[in-house]
């Protein structure tokens, strides 16, 4: 019974702290009804946990009960909010530095189904043939129905060299398909670059990491030495996103000082933020084509949306993923944490792309691979690989043709002309 008393004590302290927080958040009189309802609900919550602790057929550790309750609460909020146990919380910092163990796959919950945003280029999932939009229905034979996002991530990670089987459903497949994938230490190089044709440069962003903005500058300076860049293809296809600040750093390299890149709105005042171009280093003297597809999400959509709204780039490809919310990682006292949606972001013209995505100015579909078609053998030389890709990639071909046409016409902005000044309403 000492364990039961401990659970009750912890829960009642939590309830009192929550009520105190609510009281300090505003006028007591105006919120008294809400506080009373909250207290009654917490009493019910405590009552249920106490019954489980005393009458459930098997003994359950108190922390497991509390963790399960927290997970259930967050699962009911939205697809991107989740509870992080101490192990998962420690791993959260790894992805932003560009190195972690697993399959190399970005996932989310879409319509309550575990869905692939994109496989990261060059990783085991990418080589295995996993595609954006694939629905993961089983992990190692376990159904993913009602599985929390953080739990799915944890199950797919593991020791490099170990194997895992995931089952996916895909449009065009009559039944689920099993993929056996060997885990690797995932090291993501966020920026790759090359020359498509003389004067037409190519920058591929795989993720938005801490040094992505700096790496973009390095690539541009490399190709601008001795010759002038006459056009740029910025490839954001299958880029699942990353750091908001990094997406702002990339966007502002192509916008005049003071131009709005993105703004966020949330319930808490400190979540209402505006990010403007600093003007530290602006590349404004050549046209840009931004490539997007279904695997372009979050930070990728911030960049595409900002450059599109200001008429700085033509967006080409297919509809992007549509993740327009901001998650904040909040540490908890026992080493665990919350990944909580705290705001939504908007493009300079006030567009929310959440659940909608960025619509390209020019839609170019990619041909679907034939059944049983194998990917081409890898080419180690980066420039040779890029030239080979250009032969097989209709979206990239169209981007180059468009830049060549702009070059002939001596244009440095979008063909449609300069946009009107965005009208932005921020609370």
Label for each model-derived stretch:
Residues 337, 344-427:
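Conserved functional hotspot residues or short segments at active or partner-binding sites
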Residues 2-81, 114, 226, 389-398, ...:
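Terminal targeting/pro-maturation regions of precursor/exported proteins
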Residues 113, 199-200, 204-211, 365, ...:
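Well-structured core secondary-structure elements of compact alpha/beta domains
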Residues 2, 28-41, 45-62, 115-119, ...:
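Cleft-lining beta-strand/loop regions that shape enzyme active-site pockets
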């Amino acid at each position: 019974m000492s364990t039961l008393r401990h659970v009750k004590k912890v829960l009642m302290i939590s309830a009192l702290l929550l009520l105190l927080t609510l009281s300090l958040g505003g006028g007591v009189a105006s919120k008294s009804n809400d506080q009373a309802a909250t207290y009654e609900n917490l009493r019910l919550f405590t009552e249920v946990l106490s019954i489980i602790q005393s009458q459930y057929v098997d003994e359950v550790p108190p922390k497991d009960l509390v963790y399960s309750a927290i997970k259930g609460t967050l699962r009911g909020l939205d697809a991107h909010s989740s509870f992080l146990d101490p192990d998962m919380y420690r791993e959260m910092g790894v992805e932003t530095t560009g190195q972690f163990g697993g399959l190399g796959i970005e996932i989310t919950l879409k319509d309550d189904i575990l869905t692939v945003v994109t496989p990261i280029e060059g990783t085991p999932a990418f080589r295995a043939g996993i595609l954006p939009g694939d629905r993961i229905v089983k992990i190692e034979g376990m159904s993913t129905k009602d599985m929390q996002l953080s739990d799915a991530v944890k199950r797919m990670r593991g020791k490099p060299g170990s194997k895992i089987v995931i089952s996916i459903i895909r449009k065009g497949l009559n039944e689920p398909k099993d993929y056996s994938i060997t885990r690797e230490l995932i090291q993501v190089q966020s920026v790759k670059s090359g020359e498509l044709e003389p004067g037409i440069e190519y920058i591929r962003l795989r993720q938005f990491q801490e040094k992505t903005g700096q790496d973009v500058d390095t690539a541009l300076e490399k190709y601008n030495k001795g010759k002038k860049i006459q056009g740029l293809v910025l490839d954001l296809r299958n880029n699942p996103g990353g750091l908001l600040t990094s997406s702002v750093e990339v966007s502002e390299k192509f916008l005049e000082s003071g131009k709005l890149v993105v703004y966020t709105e949330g319930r808490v005042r400190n979540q209402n933020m505006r990010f403007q171009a600093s003007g530290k280093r602006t590349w404004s003297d050549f046209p840009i084509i931004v490539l997007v597809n279904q695997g372009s999400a979050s930070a990728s959509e911030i960049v595409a949306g900002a450059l599109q709204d200001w008429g700085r780039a033509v967006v080409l490809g297919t509809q992007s993923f549509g993740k327009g919310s901001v998650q904040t990682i909040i540490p908890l006292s026992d080493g665990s944490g919350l990944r909580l949606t705290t705001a939504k972001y908007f493009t300079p013209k006030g567009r929310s792309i959440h659940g909608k995505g960025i619509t390209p100015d020019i839609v170019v579909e990619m041909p679907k691979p034939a059944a049983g078609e194998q990917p081409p053998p890898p080419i180690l030389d980066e420039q040779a690989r890029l030239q080979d890709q250009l032969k097989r990639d209709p979206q990239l071909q169209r981007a180059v043709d468009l830049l060549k046409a702009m070059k002939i016409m001596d244009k440095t902005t979008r063909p449609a002309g300069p946009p009107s000044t965005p009208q932005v309403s921020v609370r």
